[in-house]
Amino acid sequence: MFSLDFSFSGRKNRKICSHARDIYYICGERRFIVAIFALKYDLKMRKKPIVALIYDFDGTLSPGNMQEFGFIQAIGKKPQEFWQESDEIAAGQDASNILSYMKLMFDEARKAGIKLRREDFKRFGASVELFDGVKEWFGLINEYGKSRGVKVEHYINSSGLAEMIEGTAIAKEFKRIFACSFIYNKDGEAEWPGVAVDYTAKTQFLFKINKGILSVRDNKKVNESQAEDNKRVPFPHMIYFGDGETDVPCKKIVKMFGGNSIAVYNPEIKKKVNVAKKLLRQERVNFITPADYTKESRTYQVVCSIIDKIKINFDLARLARSK
């Protein structure tokens, strides 16, 4: 067994060592070296700005609700029929629309003899359609950020199902998928809602991203006071993407705290276009763009310009602090 000397000098090293003790006790000595290396790497990355791109999913990255690309058909219903029944449950019980659709999925799958295990949700997720350019989008933006000295991270903040999103072709692109999910029994089958995310619950994940907290369960660290300089992703470094009015609380918070909110819309659906224009007119978002994520799109142009602005402001602030 080797000994560990935590008595380094310097404010930064003391901070590293404070975290190191915790990591050592949690991980054990064999994993300690890897853990402390990762910690030092994270602190090093803070020398360059981290920009968080946070996306709603349904209607934002995909042209429809994820349940409409295989699951609803598998239970023998039409999308309109399924959502009407879900709304009736919510209205009749004065219940959450999110918990109502999760219950309906569970009940209808059981009637149809369909098992709902993680792998089953992922299989349905693999059929979810995406807007033009979405698959290539992450590589394009990551590369642009790298060329500007910026680290880009991607997050999902959705009222859809995390398990289905995990089955999509783009799941690996996200640092964290914040979304609804089920609790599973010993046989691996869904038996109860584990996380339900409605339009106001979404806002908590902005503050978790802000402080670098990836756990859904955590309700302590996210509420602890933290100096602005220590927050992993400042709000001005956030870009929020959403298609509708259910994302308004998140869009408004990000915009209010100096970040940028983008209302994306399907140009083929007039109602979606009108909603986006309304949000811009009401100053709830900074920009509106068609749901096109190709390199030639307005979305790409807007996001690259925001990244440029973030980097310039970051460099100016650092110069102002230097002697």
Where are the language model's segments positioned?
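Intrinsic-disorder-associated, low-complexity terminal segments enriched in Asp/Asn/His/Tyr and depleted
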Residues: D5, N13, D22-Y25, D42
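Short, low-complexity, intrinsically disordered N-terminal modules
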Residues: S7-G10, A35
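Ala/Thr-enriched low-complexity intrinsically disordered regions
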Residues: A20, A35-A38
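Short linear segments in intrinsically disordered or otherwise low-structure-confidence regions
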Residues: R30-I33
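Alpha-helical substrate-recognition element adjacent to the catalytic core
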Residues: F37-K186, L279, E283-F287
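C-terminal cap/substrate-recognition subdomain and adjoining C-terminal extension
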Residues: G125-Y155, S159-K323
